[in-house]
C-alpha cells in the first residue's frame, strides 16, 4: 500500500519533470536511432551487392577479341600438333563469327612460347591483352609419348587460362570469401575464354556442337536482403555490433544517472528520504520512467535489426527478451554508478565510458576460446553478457562461411539467463551500496550492518537508558528540566560531534553537543553564522553522518536506525530543495502522497496547505519563478504536509517580508500541537516569540538552553535603550560620547551594547529603574541636540542576550589567542576604513585578464576531476588514437585486390574430396531416359542427380542448398545418342548455377558438362586450370598500397571523440558559471565582456594548442608520409579546429543548466554530427572511385563543403583522410596529391575551419552585447508605459515630477517610467512586476527598497544592473543610459545578488583577489586591501576554505566584501543580511554605513531595524507599485505618527491581555496580534502630546507582560499597515 502510493507519486513527479524538458526527450529518442543509423551506414559501405538471379550469357569470345585485345597463347618451347590445331580451330571460329578470313584474325592472337616472356608482355601491355592460354607441356593424358603425338582415346587435353589475378577468383581459396563469388568468372574474361577453348576443342576433335552457356546465381535458401549483410555481419556486427547497440541504449542510462545524481547533489533525494521516502519506490519510479521512453526505442531497434534481417536466425522472442533485459541492466547500472558519484559534472560521461569499455572487453571474451563457464562467470557484467548474445546471434547467421567450435560459444538462452541473474545481482548491489557507500549527504550503515541485531530488530530506548550509557551535560546556563518531562523527550542529543577537513585544516563544526527537545514545543536553535546549527540539523535528519556521538529521535538512534526515524520527519533545510520546473501545487501533491495522505484527500490537502502558507495565488506557478521568500513558504508547506511529527525548520523565514514572517508565526503556532519543531533563525524576535525553549550554540558547543525568560533573567542586565541617529549625522558629526555621558548622569550603570550604522543601543541596569521617568523627560528635550531621530525602550531582549554572549565568547577567544588578534571597535573601524578607502585605479583590462586566468588556474588545481575530463582524457583519447593508428598501420595491409597466382584446376574434386555429400542437380527437357547415357563417362557421374521436369527446379535447389556447389539446367532438347555415339545435334544450351559459398563453382560446372560431352562422343577429357598473371597494380592501388583503411577510420573516429569531449568539457564550465550567476556578477563588477570571453578562450586554447602540438608531433614521429611532410598544415588544421569548436561549445552551453548535461550533450552533438557526415561522405566518395564517375565526385565535393560548413569536426576528418591517403581522397585520374593547399584538397576545409573560427569567436565575443545593440534599435524609453495610478501617493507623484526634467548627470541613479511586464504562459497569467516607477537617488544616499515577497524589488535591481531589459522606461546610472551605453553605465557599480554568486571551489581570499583585479585596484595594494576586508568581516578563520562550505551568513560577508572592493560609486544590495546573525548584521551595517557616505546605494531588506539603521529614504512596494516615498521619519509621520508598542503576554493573560492594554493606555489601537505577541499604536497628536516616559511607566507596572518594547512608531508598524491588508480582520476583532 505504502510502496504503491509512493511509486505512483514518484512516477508522476518524474513524468512531470521529463515532460517539461521536451528537448531532452527528443535527444533521448533521436540519439539512439542516429547511432543505429550510423551502424547501418557503415554496413551499407561494405554490404554485398544484391545477387543477380537472372541468367547471364557467357560473353562471346569472338566479338571481344581483337588487335587491341589480343589472346596470348603458348607452351614451353612450342605447341604440339593438338595444341596448334585447337588454336587454329579457334581462329577459324572467330573468323567465321566475325565474317573475316583466318588471315585477318591472325593479329587477334599472339603466340609466346616462353612463360616468363608472356608474363613480361602482360606486365608491360596488359591494357591490350584479352587474356592468355598456356598449354601444358603434354596434353596427352592417355599415355602418348611424343609431344606431337595425337591424344589417344581416353586422353586429356589440358590448358591454363591466364588473366590478371584481380580479374579472377582467389585461387588460394575454395570456399566463401568476403564480397566474392563465381560471378567474377562471368563478368570478366575467364568464362569467355573457357567456352571458346572448349568450343575449339570440340571442333578440333570432330564434335560438331555449338555451346550456348549461361550462368545464374544459385537460389539461396535465404532472402536477398539476408545476403546483403553477410560481409557486414561478419566484419562489424560480430566484432563491434554490441558496442553500437550499447552506445545507443546508454543514452537513456546517461540521462538517468545524471538526473539521479542531480537530485542527490541538490539534496532533493535526501530531503525526500528524510520525509519517509521508500528507496525501492524511488529507484523503481526512475526505472519505469526511463522505460517509458527507452523501451519503445529499444523495441524499435529490435524491429530494425530483425526487419532488416541483420539478425536472421534468432527468433523475435529471443531478441526482444535479450535487448529488453540488457536495457534494464543498463538502467540498474546507472543507479549503481549514481551511488558512487556526488557531482553531476562527470557521472553521465564516465558511466558511458565505463560501460563501453566493459562491452569492448566483452567482445574480446566472446570471440576467444574461453570456456563457457568462464564466459558465464564474466557475464555478471551485463555488457559482457550482451556481447556474448550479439556474437551468437551473428555467428548463427554466418554458419555458411564460418567453421565454429560450438564448445566455446555461449548460447542465447544462457545469455538471457545471465542477464536475468545480473538484474537480481544489481538490485541487491543497489540496496547494499545505497546503505554503506558514504556520500556527500546522508548517513550510511556500517559495511557489516547485515550482521547486526539492531538492523533487523531495532530497539527503542528511553531517556533513562540513554543517559545511563552516555555522558551527561550539566551547566548553570541550562535551565533544569523536570525528570518527568525529561523522560518524555522526543529528541535527545548526546555528545554529537562533526568534523570537516577544510583548506584551513580540521574544523569542528559541532563539538560534543548535548540537548533535549520535547513534543508540543518549538525549540529554537540560535547561534552565530558557522556555529553548527545547520550541521546539527543535517545530522539529526540523516543528511550528514556524525563523526562521533549520537542522537535519539523517538527512541531511535540516528547512526543506525534512521530508516525508523524518517517517517516522522518533516524538513525545511537552509537551502530550497525544490524542482524549479514543477509548480507549487505539484510539489505539495508529491510530498503529501509521500508522507501518507490518503489518495482522495491529497489534492484537497495540497491546496489547503498552499493557502495556509500564503501561496494560494501561486499554486500553478513554477517554483523557479517564485521569489526567495515564496520558496521558503513552499518548503515550509512541504515540511508540514502529511503525518510529520518532528519538524526541522532551518532559517525558514530567511528572505521573507515582515507580513510573511508573521503569517509563518501564526502557522507554526497553529500546527505545533503534537509536534516537536526545531527552528533555527537569525530573527531573534522570532525565536523569542515562537520558542518554548531556546538553545544558543557557539563554536559548535551548547552555550545555554532554556525558556526565553530564563535566558533573559540569566544573561540580561535590565533594560535596552535603542536610539536611531539622524542619518545625516550617523557617520559624521554624531558624538556618541556626548550621548553616553548624558545617559550616565541619570543612570550610572548604563553601558553601550552596540553602535552600528544609525543604531546606538545601551544596556540600562534594573537598579536605576526609579531614575527612568526623569531621564526620559530630559532625554526627550535633548533629542535634536544629540542628533537622535527616534528611540525605544524595552526590557532585556533576546537580541541583547545573543550579542552579550557573542561578545563574551569573543573575549574568551581573543584571550586564548594571547591578544594577538584583539577584536575591538577601533581596530574594526580601522580595517573598515582601510578596506573601503582603497580606490580603483580604473579598469585595467590586462589586470582583469590576469585575474580571470588565475581564477581558471585555481579552479583547475582544486578540481582535478574536471581537469582530467577537460584535458587529460581528451589528450589520452587523441594519443590513443595515434597509437592505434600506428599499430594497425604496421600490421598486414588489407588488399583491395586479389593477388593470388597459385594455379588451381577447375575440378569438382576440390570440393567432393572433402565432402562426399556434394552432388550436382541436373534437369533436362523431355529426355528423362537418356540423361544417364549422356554423362555416364564422366568420372563424377555418381554426383549427377537428375531432377524430373515436373519438379520446380528452383524450389529443389533452395531445399538442397547445402548439398550442392552448383547445378545444371539444360534449356534445349538434349543431344540424341545413337549407337555410334555420334552427336546429331549442333546445339547444346544450358545454365550453370553457381553457389555463392563456392567461389569456383561456375567454371567447374562448365568444365564438368563440357568434359562429359567430349568424353561421351570422343572419349577425350578436358582439364582447365586457372593460372593467374601477377596483378598489374593501378596507380590508385600503388598509392594506397601502404594504406590501412580500417586504421584510418578508427583513428578518425577516436580523434573526433577526443576533440568533441575537449570542447564539451570546456563548455561545461561556462554553463556552470552562467547558471551560478558568477558571469553576471563579473560583468556588474566592471569586467569587460570581451575580457571574460578572451580569458576563457585563451585558457582553453592554451591546453587545446598543447594537445594539438603533441598530437601533430607524435603523429609526425610515428607515421611516415604526409603527416610528417605536411606537419604545418595539420597543426594549422588542429589549431583552427580548436579555435572553432571551443567558442561553438560555449554558445551551445547556453541551452544547458548543469555542467554534466552540458558536457554530455555538447560532446554527443559534435561527435554524432561529425560521425554521420563522415560516413555519408565516405560512401559517396568510394562510389565515385569504384565507378570512376566524375559527376559523383563533384557531388561529393559539394556534400563535403556543406558538411564542413555545418560541422567543423567533419572538416577535421576530411583533412585527416586527405593526409592519410585514404582511398578516394585524390581526384579521379590522379593518385598523388601534387599540391595539398589547393582547393581540391586541404584548401577548402582549412578555409572553412578558419571561417568557423572567426564566426564563432566573433559571435561569442558579441553575444553579450546583443541587448545593447538591440537597445539602439528598440530603446524601452521610446515605448509607452501605462499611466500612473490615479490614487498614487503624493510623495511618489512629487518624485515623478522632480525627475521629469532632470538631466541624467544630476543624480547617479535615475529611472523614469520604469515598467516590466512578464508575459503569461499556460495557466500562469501575465504579471506586472514593476509598474511605471520613477526614482532618483543622489550621491551619499542609501535608499531602502522595501516590499512584500514578489513585490518587484529584485526585478527592479535586475533592470538597473542590466540583467533584465525593461518593457518600457529609461534608466541612467552615473549619467549613462543602461540600454544604449551599458558598459559606461555599469562601469563603476557593485551588486550583491539575492542569492550568492560564488565559485564554490575558491576561498574567500581568492574571491577578493579576483574581484580586486576586476575592479582595477593596484596590484601593490591588493594584498592589504584583501586582508583588511577579511579582518573587517571576521573571516580570518575560514578565509582559505572553499566558499561552498560556508554558512549562509559567511557567504553574504564574502559577497558584500566583493561588492565593496574598489570604492564603487553605485551599489545595489539585495537582501544583504539575509541569513546573517545579529552580530554579523551589525558588522555589515558598519561597512554599509561607511560606504554610503559618498555613494548612491539601493538596499532591499526584510529587516526593518536594518533599514532604519542604514537608509535615509525609503519606498514600500506592493504589487510593483510604490505605496510611499520619503525619509523614514517622513513615512512614519504620514502613516504612523505617535508610538508603537510591542508586548509579549504571559500565557495566563492571553485572553485578557489585549483589553488590559487598551484600557490602560488612552487611544491605543491594535495593529497586529499573534498568540501571546501583539503590536499597538498610540497616537501622539501635537495638541495633546503623550510622553514616552508615561507609556513606559504604565507598561512597567503591568504584571501581565513577560516582555515589552516601546518607542516612536516603528517602521515595521508602518510596513504592516501599508502592506498587511490581510490582517484587517484580525485587527477588527479588537475594535
Curated annotation (Swiss-Prot):
Protein name: ABC transporter A family member 6
Cellular component per GO, a single term: membrane
GO molecular function: ABC-type transporter activity; ATP binding; ATP hydrolysis activity; ATPase-coupled transmembrane transporter activity; lipid transporter activity
PANTHER family referenced in this protein's UniProt entry, alphabetically: ATP-BINDING CASSETTE SUB-FAMILY A MEMBER 2 (PTHR19229:SF36), ATP-BINDING CASSETTE TRANSPORTER SUBFAMILY A ABCA (PTHR19229)
GO process terms (BP): lipid transport; sorocarp morphogenesis
SMART domains: AAA
Residue stretches spanning the membrane: 25-45, 242-262, 285-305, 317-337, 346-366, 372-392, 416-436, 866-886, 1047-1067, 1099-1119, 1127-1147, 1158-1178, 1198-1218, 1242-1262
Amino-acid positions noted as binding ATP 1 in the UniProt annotation, renumbered to this chain: 527-534
Record keyword Ribonucleoprotein present: no
UniProt topology in membrane: Multi-pass membrane protein
Family classification: Belongs to the ABC transporter superfamily. ABCA family.
Keyword Membrane assigned: yes
Domain ABC transporter: 491-724, 1309-1544
InterPro entries: AAA+_ATPase, ABC2_TM, ABC_transporter-like_ATP-bd, ABC_transporter-like_CS, ABCA, P-loop_NTPase
Subcellular location: Membrane
Record gene name: abcA6
Keywords linked to the UniProt accession: ATP-binding, Membrane, Nucleotide-binding, Repeat, Transmembrane, Transmembrane helix, Transport
Binding positions for ATP 2 per the UniProt entry: 1347-1354
Annotated organism of origin: Dictyostelium discoideum (Social amoeba)
Amino acid at each position: 500500500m505504502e510502496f504503491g502510493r509512493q511509486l505512483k507519486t514518484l512516477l508522476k513527479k518524474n513524468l512531470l519533470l521529463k515532460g517539461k524538458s521536451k528537448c531532452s526527450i527528443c535527444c533521448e529518442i533521436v540519439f539512439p536511432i542516429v547511432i543505429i543509423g550510423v551502424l547501418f551506414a557503415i554496413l551499407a559501405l561494405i554490404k554485398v551487392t544484391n545477387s543477380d538471379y537472372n541468367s547471364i550469357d557467357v560473353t562471346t569470345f569472338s566479338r571481344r577479341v581483337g588487335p587491341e585485345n589480343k589472346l596470348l597463347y603458348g607452351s614451353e618451347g612450342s605447341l604440339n600438333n593438338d595444341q596448334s590445331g585447337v588454336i587454329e580451330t579457334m581462329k577459324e571460329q572467330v573468323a567465321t563469327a566475325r565474317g573475316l578470313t583466318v588471315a585477318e584474325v591472325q593479329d587477334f592472337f599472339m603466340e609466346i612460347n616462353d612463360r616468363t616472356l608472356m608474363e613480361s608482355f602482360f606486365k608491360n601491355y596488359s591494357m591490350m591483352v584479352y587474356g592468355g592460354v598456356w598449354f601444358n607441356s603434354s596434353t596427352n593424358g592417355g599415355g602418348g609419348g611424343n609431344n606431337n603425338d595425337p591424344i589417344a582415346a581416353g586422353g586429356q587435353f589440358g590448358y591454363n587460362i591466364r588473366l590478371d589475378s584481380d580479374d579472377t577468383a582467389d585461387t588460394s581459396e575454395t570456399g566463401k570469401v568476403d564480397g566474392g563469388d563465381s560471378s567474377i568468372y562471368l563478368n570478366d574474361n575467364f568464362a569467355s575464354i573457357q567456352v571458346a577453348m572448349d568450343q575449339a576443342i570440340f571442333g578440333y576433335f570432330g564434335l560438331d556442337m555449338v555451346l550456348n552457356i549461361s550462368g545464374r546465381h544459385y537460389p539461396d535458401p535465404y532472402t536477398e536482403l539476408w545476403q546483403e549483410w553477410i560481409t557486414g555481419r561478419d566484419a562489424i556486427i560480430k566484432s563491434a555490433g554490441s558496442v553500437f547497440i550499447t552506445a545507443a541504449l546508454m543514452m537513456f542510462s546517461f540521462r538517468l544517472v545524471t538526473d539521479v545524481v542531480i537530485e542527490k547533489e541538490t539534496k532533493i533525494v535526501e530531503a525526500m528520504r528524510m520525509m519517509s521516502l521508500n528507496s525501492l519506490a524511488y529507484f523503481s519510479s526512475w526505472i519505469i520512467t526511463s522505460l517509458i521512453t527507452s523501451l519503445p526505442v529499444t523495441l524499435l531497434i529490435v524491429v530494425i535489426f530483425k526487419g532488416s534481417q541483420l539478425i536472421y536466425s534468432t527468433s523475435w522472442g529471443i531478441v526482444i527478451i535479450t535487448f529488453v533485459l540488457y536495457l534494464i541492466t543498463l538502467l540498474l547500472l546507472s543507479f549503481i554508478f549514481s551511488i558512487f558519484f556526488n557531482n553531476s559534472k562527470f557521472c553521465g560521461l564516465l558511466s558511458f565510458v565505463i560501460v563501453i569499455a566493459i562491452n569492448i572487453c566483452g567482445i574480446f571474451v566472446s570471440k576467444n576460446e574461453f570456456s563457457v563457464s568462464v564466459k558465464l562467470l564474466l557475464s555478471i557484467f551485463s555488457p559482457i553478457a550482451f556481447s556474448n548474445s550479439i556474437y551468437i546471434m551473428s555467428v548463427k547467421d554466418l554458419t555458411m562461411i564460418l567453421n565454429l567450435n560450438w564448445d566455446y560459444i555461449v548460447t542465447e538462452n544462457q545469455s538471457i539467463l545471465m542477464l536475468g541473474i545480473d538484474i537480481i545481482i544489481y538490485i541487491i548491489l543497489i540496496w547494499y551500496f545505497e546503505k554503506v557507500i558514504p556520500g556527500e549527504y546522508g548517513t550510511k550503515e556500517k559495511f557489516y550492518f547485515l550482521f547486526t541485531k539492531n538492523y533487523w530488530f531495532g530497539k527503542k530506548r528511553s531517556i533513562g537508558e540513554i543517559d545511563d550509557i552516555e555522558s551527561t551535560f550539566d551547566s548553570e546556563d541550562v535551565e533544569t528540566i523536570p525528570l518527568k518531562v525529561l523522560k518524555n523527550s522526543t529528541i535527545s542529543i548526546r555528545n554529537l560531534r562533526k568534523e570537516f577537513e577544510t583548506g584551513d585544516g580540521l574544523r569542528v563544526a559541532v563539538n560534543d553537543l548535548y540537548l533535549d527537545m520535547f513534543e508540543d514545543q518549538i525549540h529554537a536553535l540560535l547561534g552565530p553564522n558557522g556555529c553548527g546549527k545547520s550541521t546539527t540539523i543535517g545530522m539529526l535528519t540523516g543528511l550528514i553522518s556524525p563523526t562521533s556521538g549520537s542522537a535519539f529521535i523517538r527512541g531511535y538512534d540516528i547512526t543506525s536506525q534512521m530508516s525508523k526515524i524518517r517517517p516522522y520527519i518533516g524538513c525545511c533545510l537552509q537551502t530550497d530543495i525544490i524542482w524549479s520546473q514543477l509548480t507549487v501545487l505539484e510539489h505539495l501533491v508529491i510530498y503529501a502522497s509521500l508522507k501518507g495522505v490518503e489518495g482522495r484527500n491529497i489534492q484537497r490537502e495540497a491546496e489547503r496547505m498552499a493557502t495556509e502558507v500564503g501561496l494560494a495565488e501561486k499554486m500553478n506557478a513554477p517554483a523557479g519563478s517564485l521569489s526567495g521568500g515564496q520558496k521558503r513558504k513552499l518548503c515550509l508547506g512541504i515540511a508540514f504536509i502529511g503525518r510529520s511529527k518532528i519538524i526541522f525548520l532551518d532559517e525558514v523565514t530567511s528572505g521573507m517580508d515582515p507580513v510573511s514572517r508573521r503569517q509563518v508565526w501564526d502557522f507554526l503556532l497553529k500546527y505545533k500541537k503534537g509536534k516537536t519543531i526545531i527552528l533555527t533563525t537569525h530573527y531573534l524576535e522570532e525565536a523569542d516569540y515562537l520558542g518554548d525553549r531556546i538553545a544558543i550554540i557557539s563554536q559548535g558547543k551548547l552555550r545555554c538552553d532554556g525558556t526565553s525568560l530564563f535566558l533573559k533573567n540569566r544573561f540580561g542586565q535590565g533594560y535596552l535603550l535603542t536610539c536611531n541617529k539622524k542619518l545625516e549625522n550617523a557617520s559624521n558629526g554624531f558624538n556618541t560620547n556626548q550621548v553616553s555621558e548624558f545617559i550616565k548622569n541619570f543612570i550610572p550603570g548604563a553601558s553601550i551594547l552596540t553602535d552600528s550604522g544609525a543604531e546606538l543601543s545601551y544596556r540600562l541596569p534594573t537598579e536605576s529603574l526609579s531614575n527612568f521617568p526623569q531621564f526620559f523627560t530630559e532625554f526627550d528635550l535633548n533629542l535634536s541636540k544629540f542628533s537622535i531621530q527616534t528611540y525605544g525602550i524595552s526590557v532585556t531582549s533576546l537580541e541583547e542576550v545573543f550579542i552579550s554572549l557573542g561578545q563574551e565568547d569573543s573575549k574568551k577567544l581573543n584571550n586564548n589567542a594571547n591578544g594577538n588578534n584583539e577584536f575591538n571597535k577601533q581596530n574594526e573601524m580601522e580595517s573598515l576604513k582601510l578596506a573601503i578607502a582603497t580606490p580603483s585605479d580604473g579598469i585595467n583590462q590586462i589586470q582583469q585578464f590576469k585575474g580571470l586566468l588565475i581564477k581558471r588556474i585555481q579552479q583547475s588545481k582544486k578540481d582535478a576531476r574536471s581537469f582530467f575530463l577537460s584535458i587529460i582524457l581528451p589528450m589520452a583519447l587523441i594519443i590513443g588514437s595515434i597509437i592505434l593508428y600506428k599499430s594497425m598501420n604496421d600490421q598486414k595491409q588489407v588488399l583491395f585486390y586479389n593477388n593470388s597466382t597459385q594455379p588451381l584446376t577447375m575440378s569438382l574434386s576440390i570440393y567432393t574430396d572433402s565432402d562426399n555429400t556434394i552432388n550436382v542437380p541436373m534437369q533436362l527437357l523431355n529426355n528423362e531416359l537418356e540423361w544417364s547415357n549422356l554423362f555416364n563417362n564422366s568420372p563424377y557421374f555418381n554426383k549427377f542427380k537428375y531432377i524430373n521436369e515436373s519438379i520446380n527446379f528452383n524450389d529443389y535447389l533452395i531445399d538442397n542448398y547445402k548439398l550442392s556447389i552448383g547445378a545444371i539446367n539444360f534449356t534445349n532438347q538434349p543431344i540424341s545418342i545413337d549407337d555410334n555415339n555420334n552427336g546429331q545435334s549442333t546445339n547444346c544450351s544450358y545454365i550453370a548455377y553457381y553457389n555463392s559459398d563456392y567461389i569456383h563453382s561456375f567454371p567447374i560446372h562448365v568444365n564438368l558438362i563440357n568434359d562429359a560431352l567430349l568424353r561421351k562422343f570422343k572419349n577425350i577429357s578436358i582439364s582447365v586450370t586457372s593460372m593467374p598473371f601477377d596483378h598489374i597494380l593501378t596507380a590508385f592501388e600503388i598509392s594506397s598500397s601502404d594504406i590501412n583503411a580500417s586504421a584510418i577510420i578508427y583513428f578518425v573516429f577516436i580523434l573526433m571523440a577526443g576533440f568533441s569531449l575537449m570542447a564539451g568539457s570546456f563548455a561545461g564550465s561556462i554553463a556552470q558559471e552562467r547558471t551560478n550567476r558568477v558571469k553576471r556578477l563579473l560583468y556588474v563588477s566592471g569586467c569587460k565582456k570581451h575580457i571574460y570571453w578572451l580569458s576563457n578562450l585563451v585558457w582553453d586554447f592554451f591546453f587545446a594548442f598543447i594537445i594539438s602540438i603533441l598530437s601533430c608531433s607524435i603523429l609526425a614521429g610515428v607515421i611516415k608520409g604526409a603527416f610528417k611532410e605536411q606537419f604545418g598544415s595539420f597543426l594549422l588544421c588542429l589549431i583552427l579546429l580548436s579555435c572553432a569548436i571551443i567558442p561553438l561549445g560555449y554558445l551551445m552551453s547556453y541551452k544547458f543548466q548543469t555542467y554534466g548535461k552540458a558536457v554530455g550533450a555538447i560532446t554527443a552533438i559534435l561527435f554524432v554530427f561529425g560521425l554521420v557526415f563522415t560516413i555519408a561522405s565516405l560512401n559517396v566518395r568510394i562510389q565515385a572511385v569504384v565507378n570512376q564517375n566524375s559527376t559523383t565526385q563533384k557531388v561529393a565535393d559539394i556534400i563535403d563543403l556543406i558538411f564542413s560548413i555545418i560541422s567543423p569536426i567533419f572538416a577535421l576528418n576530411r583533412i585527416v583522410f586527405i593526409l592519410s591517403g585514404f582511398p578516394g581522397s585524390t581526384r579521379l585520374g590522379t593518385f598523388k596529391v601534387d599540391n595539398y593547399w589547393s582547393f581540391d584538397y586541404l584548401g577548402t576545409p582549412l578555409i572553412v575551419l578558419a571561417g568557423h573560427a572567426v564566426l564563432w569567436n566573433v559571435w561569442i565575443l558579441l553575444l553579450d552585447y546583443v541587448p545593447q545593440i538591440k537597445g539602439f534599435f528598440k530603446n524601452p524609453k521610446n515605448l509607452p508605459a501605462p499611466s500612473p495610478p490615479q490614487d498614487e501617493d503624493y510623495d511618489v507623484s512629487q518624485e515623478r515630477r522632480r525627475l521629469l526634467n532632470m538631466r541624467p548627470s544630476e543624480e547617479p541613479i535615475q529611472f523614469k517610467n520604469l515598467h516590466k511586464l512578464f508575459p503569461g504562459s499556460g495557466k500562469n497569467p501575465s504579471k506586472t512586476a514593476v509598474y511605471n516607477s520613477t526614482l532618483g537617488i543622489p550621491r551619499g544616499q542609501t535608499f531602502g527598497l522595501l516590499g512584500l515577497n514578489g513585490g518587484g524589488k529584485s526585478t527592479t535591481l535586475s533592470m538597473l544592473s542590466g540583467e533584465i531589459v525593461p518593457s518600457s522606461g529609461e534608466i541612467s546610472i552615473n549619467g549613462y543610459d543602461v540600454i544604449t551605453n551599458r558598459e559606461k553605465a555599469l562601469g563603476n557599480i557593485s551588486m550583491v545578488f539575492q542569492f550568492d554568486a560564488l565559485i564554490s571551489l575558491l576561498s574567500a581570499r581568492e574571491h577578493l583577489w579576483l574581484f580586486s583585479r576586476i575592479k582595477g585596484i593596484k596590484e601593490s595594494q591588493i594584498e592589504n586591501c584583501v586582508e583588511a576586508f577579511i579582518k573587517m568581516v571576521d573571516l580570518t578563520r575560514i578565509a582559505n576554505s572553499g566558499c561552498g562550505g560556508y554558512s549562509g551568513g559567511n557567504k553574504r560577508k564574502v559577497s558584500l566584501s566583493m561588492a565593496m572592493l574598489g570604492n564603487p560609486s553605485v551599489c545595489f544590495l539585495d537582501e544583504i543580511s539575509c541569513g546573517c546573525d545579529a552580530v554579523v548584521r551589525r558588522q555589515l551595517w558598519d561597512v554599509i554605513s561607511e560606504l554610503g557616505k559618498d555613494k548612491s546605494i539601493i538596499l532591499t531588506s526584510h529587516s526593518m531595524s536594518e533599514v532604519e539603521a542604514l537608509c535615509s529614504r525609503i519606498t514600500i512596494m506592493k504589487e510593483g507599485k510604490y505605496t510611499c516615498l520619503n525619509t523614514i521619519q517622513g513615512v512614519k509621520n504620514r502613516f504612523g505618527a505617535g508610538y508603537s508598542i510591542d508586548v509579549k503576554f504571559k500565557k495566563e493573560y492571553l485572553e485578557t491581555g489585549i483589553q488590559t492594554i487598551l484600557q490602560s493606555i488612552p487611544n491605543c489601537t491594535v495593529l497586529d496580534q499573534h498568540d501571546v505577541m501583539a503590536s499597538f499604536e498610540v497616537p501622539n497628536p501635537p495638541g495633546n502630546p503623550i510622553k514616552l516616559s508615561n507609556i513606559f511607566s504604565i507598561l512597567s507596572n503591568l504584571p501581565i507582560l513577560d516582555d515589552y518594547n516601546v518607542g516612536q512608531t516603528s517602521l515595521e508598524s508602518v510596513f504592516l499597515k501599508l502592506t498587511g491588508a490581510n490582517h484587517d480582520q484580525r485587527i477588527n476583532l479588537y475594535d
